[in-house]
Amino acid sequence: MRLGVLDVGSNTIHLQVMDAHLGARPEPATSFKVELRLTEYLDAAGSITPQGIDLLHQAVGDSVAHANENQTDEILAFATSAIRDAKNGPKIIQDINQRHQIDLQILTGDEEARMTFLAVRRWLGWSAGKLLVIDIGGGSLEIASGVDENPEATLSLPLGAARLTRDFLSGDPYTSKGVKFLEEFVSSKLEDEIPSILRAHDANHFVATSKTFRTLARLSGHMFSENPKHLESANLKTMISKLADMTNKSRAELPGVSNSRAQQIVAGAIVARATMNALDLDRVEICPWALREGVVLRRLDWLNN
C-alpha cells in the first residue's frame, strides 16, 4: 500500500509518500514540500489572512497532485497548531476538504504527542524501556512519557519555534533583551505547566524528535565535534549565545540550517534547553521518526484490526 501523509504544519506543507505494509517498516518513496510559515499570516484577531489561505490552497493542491502522480492509494492529511489555533481554522479545513477532495483533520496537541510517541516506540523497540519524548514544532511543544505504545502522560504547550520567534524576537541579530525575555518566559511557562507525572518520569530513555531537534543536534556536532545523534543540554547554553549574536544570513550558512529555519533556530534552542532543564535531562537521543511516521503506523494498526 502506498500512503501519502500530508502534514499541514506551522512551517511547511509537507507530503511524504510511503510504501507501507503490515508488519514492515514504512519506506519513504517520494516527498513534496512547500515552505509556508502560516504563523506569519495571522491577523490581529488570530485568523489566517486571505493571502495565507490562498497560498495554503495552492500548496495543498500541488501536494495532492504530487500524490496522485505517484500512484498514492490514500492520503492521510492532518493539520497541527497553526490551523488548530487560528480563529478561522474550522472554515479553512472545510474549504480545503471541499476543494481538494481530501479529509484534512485537525490533530489535538494530545493526539500529536501520542502519535509521535508511537513512532519513537516503534523505532527504538521495547528494549528501550520507559520513554520520555520531546518534540518541538513550529507552533507547539509536545512531551510524552510511558512504557507502552500509548503514553501514560502527555503535554502540549504553545511553545513552538515559529510562534515564539514571531511573538518575542526582533532585530537582526536579535536584541539581547528579547532573547533574555523569551528565555524567562519559556522557563516560567514550563515551571507552571509541566505536571508532576512528567517531572517524576523515571524514564530509561530520553528522546527528542522532529526538525528543530535534528537541526540543533547537527549544529552541536559541528560546533563541539560530537555525535549528531545526541544533544547535550550543556552545549545548548553556548549555542544559544552564539546563534543569537548572528544575523539570519549567517545562521542560514550553518550546516543543516535552511533559510526558513534560520530565523527560528534561536527560539528552538531556547525551548529545547529550558525543557531539558525542567525535566532534569543532561542529554537526549535524536530519533529520525516523528509525527508523520506515527500517523502511518496508526493507520496500519487500524487496518490490521
Predicted features and spans:
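Short, glycine/acidic-enriched loop or turn micro-motifs at the edges of active sites
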Residues: S10, G138, K211-R214
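Dinucleotide-binding Rossmann-like beta1-alpha1 core, especially the glycine-rich loop
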Residues: A77
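Conserved ATP-binding subdomain of kinase catalytic cores across diverse folds
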Residues: L22-R37, L42, G61, A67-N68
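Helical "lid/coupling" subdomains associated with nucleotide-phosphate turnover
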Residues: L3, V17, Y41-T72, T80-K130, ...
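Acidic, divalent-metal-coordinating active-site segment for phosphoryl/phosphodiester hydrolysis
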Residues: G139-S145
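N-terminal basic/disordered segments at the start of proteins
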Residues: M1-E27
